[in-house]
């Protein structure tokens, strides 16, 4: 009987250790790296960071402007596991964050990737958090002409993918917590134009996840 109890306790311990707090799809991007860094340092999270190919993740760049212009060191931490999001992901995690995208005139596969992740969503998942874009859904009508040009021209496929992602996430609203963010402009720090720094935006996302979890 004691041996059986020990085995059960051991298996429960393994399950707790192997369940990530965060699964970040797009962990190698500017916002993704902020989420990884702040998740580990500020929230003591274990993080599954998923990138286009299995490689290391750099520390986030924190400077002024919209462009990253300083090479950053690789992030190595015992609470971070990096994998390719095209691999079969069967890990347990509590919160899924989707923050992939494409550049001007590029093909955006974010909707395909979102479908892949949702089809293998673990029972342990408590929330889905999508980083969409201003100009998707009902926000297009109230957006300025610049956003409307991006939507219809050089970021056309990105907006198509974001709209599809939002539709997918909305189907899970009755099953778990879902959040869709539509930032207008993301920067790395201070800018002359109106923008939100990736540092502040990542902090907002993580606060929403873990503040509500504790209620």
Name each model feature, range by range.
Residues 20-44:
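N-terminal Rossmann NAD(P)H-binding glycine-rich loop of SDR-like oxidoreductase domains
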Residues 48-53, 115-158, 171, 179:
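Conserved Rossmann-fold NAD(P)-dependent oxidoreductase catalytic core, especially the SDR/UDP-sugar
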Residues 71-93:
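Conserved Rossmann-fold cofactor-binding substructure of NAD(P)-dependent oxidoreductases
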Residues 94-130, 164:
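NAD(P)-cofactor binding segment of oxidoreductase domains
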Residues 107-111, 144, 151-164, 195-199:
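Short-chain dehydrogenase/reductase
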Residues 166-189:
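Conserved beta-loop-beta element that borders a ligand/cofactor-binding pocket
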Residues 197-215:
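Alpha-helical substrate-binding/gating segment
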